[in-house]
Amino acid sequence: MAEKRNIFLVGPMGAGKSTIGRHLAQMLHLEFHDSDQEIEQRTGADIAWVFDVEGEEGFRRREAQVIADLSEKQGIVLATGGGSVQSKDIRNHLSARGIVVYLETTIDKQVARTQRDKRRPLLQVDDPREVLENLAEIRNPLYEEIADVIVKTDDQSAKVVANQIIEKLGF
């Protein structure tokens, strides 16, 4: 890779953005960042606390700032939060500052991968499947809008998906 390009991973909760992102960064010798982890580091609190205290709006404000800051770096792999694409500013930053890879997965896989995870505030409801379906209806077209590459993550290891991304990007 001659120039240090950024790779931004977008997709729904449970698509594997963080896990695949770590593999991808390691394989390409790039720095890895996770926008949710960065928010937690900057606030000194976990995402659930930020949602409880500041609401989703407060969380989204913090997320927009973190992604704006991180996307200015060069040579990174960034795993974004599933809802970050709902911000036009974030979509513009990602599109302008790197390669956007949409990690696509089914609702069934999302449910299976997130069902025991208590760190996902939007899923702490009686019917998380319904929430995931509603979010997919809103967010999937936005992921597709900004994606340079789409890769399905169902039934594949993170390493296999990372290799597919590298192959599709021609690195």
Swiss-Prot record:
Gene encoding it?
aroK
State a single Gene Ontology molecular function. Answer: ATP binding
Record-given protein name: Shikimate kinase
Report the pathway entry. Metabolic intermediate biosynthesis; chorismate biosynthesis; chorismate from D-erythrose 4-phosphate and phosphoenolpyruvate: step 5/7
Task: Name the chemical reaction catalysed here.
Answer: shikimate + ATP = 3-phosphoshikimate + ADP + H(+)
Answer yes or no on keyword Amino-acid biosynthesis: yes
Protein source organism: Shewanella sp. (strain MR-4)
Subunit and interaction comment: Monomer.
- UniProt-listed Enzyme Commission number(s): 2.7.1.71
* Function text: Catalyzes the specific phosphorylation of the 3-hydroxyl group of shikimic acid using ATP as a cosubstrate.
* Record's keyword terms, sorted: Amino-acid biosynthesis, Aromatic amino acid biosynthesis, ATP-binding, Cytoplasm, Kinase, Magnesium, Metal-binding, Nucleotide-binding, Transferase
Q: Which residues bind ATP?
A: G14, A15, G16, K17, S18, T19, R120, Q156
